[in-house]
């Protein structure tokens, strides 16, 4: 697992070369945002220890398998609070919350989130931002300390910055897993309006001063 210090408050953890999770530094340790694919639990725990802290909570941008893949194993090892977007948590609980077929991978989870996230909620230093489209309940997280935006899969940055509603030939082909492409574009525009200082995403490297790159991505996605 590759470890990249993006800001003093955020460490990007990359598994298999293209799937990211994030350690967000707080006074009591780390918030882990997303868990990558299955089999990563020990590596994620080790990365937090190597960075000088422990994982105190797990917050998820959405419920797809490449973001919740190691959730059950981590919860079993750590017993920490798990926070998942409201609609995606309801989907994982077996509720029918949409009227058409879901896209992306929705693995069966044993973990029941203790908190269902909605726009405006806080997770330590992170503000929850509604960003539906890639999944029905997808959220992003904005760090109030330095305006780092954890955009989940609303954008990808492998090769270049793209909105996930727009088909782009580079793996992981996020458009194929995007539930509502029009809504995803609206969310991408809303995230751009936040004027983040740094953009980090579920797939691809961090982008500093990302405004121009986000603008180009939105223009291509329209």
Labelled PLM ranges:
Residues 38, 127-130, 136-212:
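Metallo-beta-lactamase
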Residues 8-13, 35-37, 58-61, 126-129, ...:
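Short, flexible loop segments at the rims of nucleotide/cofactor-binding pockets, characterized by
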Residues 1-50, 141-153, 157:
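Conserved beta-strand hairpin/beta-sheet module of binuclear metal-dependent hydrolase folds
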Residues 208-222:
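Binuclear metal-ion centers of metallo-dependent hydrolases, dominated by the metallo-beta-lactamase
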Residues 9, 24, 34, 44, ...:
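Divalent metal-coordination and catalytic microenvironments
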Residues 40-42, 46-123, 219:
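Active-site HxH/HxHxD metal-binding segment of metal-dependent hydrolases
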Residues 31-33, 59, 82, 148-150, ...:
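Residue-level marker for buried hydrophobic side chains located in beta-strands
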């Amino acid at each position: 697992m590759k470890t990249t210090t993006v800001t003093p408050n955020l460490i990007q953890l990359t598994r298999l070369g293209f799937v990211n999770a994030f350690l967000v530094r707080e006074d009591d340790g780390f918030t882990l945002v997303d868990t990558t694919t299955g089999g990563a639990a020990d590596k994620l725990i080790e990365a937090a220890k190597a960075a000088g802290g422990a994982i105190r909570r797990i917050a998820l941008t959405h419920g797809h398998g490449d973001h919740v893949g190691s959730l059950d194993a981590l919860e079993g090892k750590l017993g920490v609070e798990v926070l998942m977007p409201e609609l995606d948590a309801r989907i994982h609980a077996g509720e029918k919350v949409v009227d058409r077929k879901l896209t992306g991978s929705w693995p069966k989870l044993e973990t029941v989130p203790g908190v269902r996230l909605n726009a405006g909620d806080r997770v330590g230093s992170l503000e929850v931002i509604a960003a539906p489209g890639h999944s029905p309940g997808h959220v992003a997280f904005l760090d109030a300390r330095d305006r780092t935006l954890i955009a989940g899969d609303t954008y990808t940055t492998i090769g270049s910055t793209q909105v996930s509603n727009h088909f782009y030939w580079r793996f992981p082909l996020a458009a194929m897993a995007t539930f509502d492409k029009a809504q995803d574009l609206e969310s991408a525009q809303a995230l751009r309006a936040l004027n983040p200082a740094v953009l980090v995403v579920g797939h691809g490297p961090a982008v500093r001063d990302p405004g121009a790159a986000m603008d180009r991505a939105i223009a291509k996605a329209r």
